[in-house]
Amino acid sequence: FRDLSGDAINYAAEKDDIGRYNADDMLIENCSFYRLLGLPINIYRGGSDESTAGPYVTIRHCTFVDCCNKERGSVMRLIGPQVLTVENCNFDNSGRGGATIRLDEATWEKVRIANCNLWNSGRMVTTTAQAIQGKMYNIRPAYTNAEAYDYVPVRGSELEKLSIGLRKN
């Protein structure tokens, strides 16, 4: 996804807050997002109906470069996922006006954010702070060929060693 004025992945159409969400099991993996004005990832599940178990969201090995730097913006807006894993993601110059990840979770939800790199990027905002697990990094990324939109970390770089960011196919 690159050079977009709107949102890239938007599953936030629920309006009545009764737990009817747009996708049940979502995997976003090995994707790059470059120069997005809107939200790269926006997922919303409202309501408190415990009979609806979901959505299940996994976001891993993604790179966000110069995304959603508007005031009070966020790179990922995740409201209500009951099972969430965000891991091995690279945030480069993104979410500076607000947050890299804005997560609204309940204490009983199974949520985990781990092994991510935040270089010149906004903070993580969570409701309970239980989601952020393990080490977060602040490493200046070096990419294979950014001019050609190849955001795979340079071979032998710290990000490659930590398995953060895009993986070479």
Put a short name on every predicted segment.
Residues 1-169:
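Extracellular beta-rich repeat passengers
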